[in-house]
Amino acid sequence: MENKIVLITGANSGIGKAAALKFATEGYRVVMACRNMVISNAVRQEIIEASKNVQVDLMELDVSSFDSIRAFCSAFKAQYPRLDILIHNAAYLNHGEKAFKLSPENIELSFATNTFGPFLMTQLLADHLEKSQDPRILNACTTNIKHFFDPKRKIDFDNLQGELLGKQLNNAYTMYGDSKMALLMLTFKMAETLKPHGIKVNALQINRVKLSKETIRKMNSFWKVLAWTQNLTNPLPSGMADNYFHICTSDEYKNVTGQLINHKRQIIQPSTSEQGFSQVKNIFGSGSYPNYATDPINVKKIWDLCISLTKTG
């Protein structure tokens, strides 16, 4: 059987790098989609040597740039006959950043990278995924969405294109959590729209994991100290990479779509209650997610905004 093709964004460090190594070791043809080609070339060689698999390719991609995504998808479809697995792993979180950062299309950088970029890539590669016998998409989510158990927490749809630039300070963690909540909402809608084409779409809720040196190097002094301290007890990225592999390849998830899966590989259910003790249980547990994610009005808002900004309607 011809090797299956897996595309992983942000595959040059952390979980993405570990996942690329896992898939390569298992004999898959791996396409690393990365922004920093200097670092990524060295990582690619490292993965080839460790996996004994020469079918590890590298393509340049900036997930925050729509132009880069369009160029990448065009080049990918010209080079590969199909796509079997698409993993939206790349993410943006600038720890402690107090200034709003915008993408080349003037979209808040967290949302451009974590939400609108994956949406556009999925839209452009859907026809190539459809050529696979068992196409699967996995979106990397986060436990940060648990902040939405607070009924006051909402995505600020009026602050995604620099509307408050220079008017108030940016909260990097809020924007990161909001963008990942939006990605989860897109997961459910993508699963619905792509189901007739046989494409399964799920999300993995990533909890604690040891941060890479590359990630820590970008932080300010305070966050560096905190990250190094947390790394003493955080598990290695390889554990979460194993989850990527299992969800995207095993028969257990062959017919699963439109689900959020936790680090124990259990399907998470929407919360039935977000008040009192139930809210505390939800925040510290891993069995439920905020029902904000399935509210049809919110889902329609982010879906329509994605179509409008990416001009894919």
Locate each region found by the language model:
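Conserved Rossmann-fold NAD(P)-dependent oxidoreductase catalytic core, especially the SDR/UDP-sugar
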Residues: 128-145, 149
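Short alpha-helical oligomerization interface
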Residues: 96-111
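A short, exposed helix-loop element centered on a Lys and neighboring polar residues
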Residues: 122-123, 188
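Ankyrin-repeat alpha-helix packing hotspot
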Residues: 115-116
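Conserved catalytic-core motifs of eukaryotic protein kinase domains, centered on the activation segment
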Residues: 97-99, 132, 149-151, 215-216
